[in-house]
Amino acid sequence: MKIINAAFIRSVSALQDLPDERVPEIVFAGRSNVGKSSLLNSLTGRKGLAKTSSTPGKTRLLNYFLINDDLYFVDIPGYGYAAVSHTEKDAWGRLLAGYVGGRQAIALVVLLLDSRHPAMESDREMMEFLAYHDRPYGIVLTKDDKLTQKERAKAKRVTASCALNAEFIVSYSSISGKGKKELLAHFDHYLSGESSGAGSDSAVTVT
């Protein structure tokens, strides 16, 4: 895939406000402050497309970005931030459960993990949630540039040991762009309908 153009379209706070399902969606999920906005900006080559914040838990909406006029990237609220109120967590939980559980347009979920702290309890819970809803997902290990070669290898081993249903695991640096080509190739694979199914031996790749 080559991204020619990208534009922010809308923020959604309720399921009834979702766009129609004629356009496929790739969903970006992960813990608060894992680097979703930085990843989206890196993938699209648009530095300010997704607003980055140093405040965990700031993204509270489903943010839609139109890619090449025929695909949505959807940035969903981060999880695992303790300072958020129970009321807000409950509201986010209902929104995400309804969206991930019922949205037919979702082609793939990209689950971002901090490569320095991969597979935390909340990450494993999200993997179980996606598997329960039979959603194909791949793993992106963010902030790869902060690790040594030995630490990178360990992060991949730890992730692979618990992400048994993941279709792929890609190490990514939003600073250098490492992993961008591989990740976009995986997107092409899913959008073309060539995926062989979550968790199959032929589908899981580590790069």
UniProtKB/Swiss-Prot annotation:
This protein's record includes keyword Magnesium: yes
Name of this chain's protein: Probable GTP-binding protein EngB
Example of a GO biological process term: division septum assembly
Lineage: Bacteria, Pseudomonadati, Chlorobiota, Chlorobiia, Chlorobiales
HAMAP family to which the protein is assigned, alphabetical: GTPase_EngB (MF_00321)
Cofactor(s) essential for the protein: Mg(2+)
CDD domains named among the record's database cross-references: YihA_EngB
EngB-type G domain: residues covered: 22-193
Species this chain originates from: Chlorobium luteolum (strain DSM 273 / BCRC 81028 / 2530)
GO CC terms, sorted: cytosol
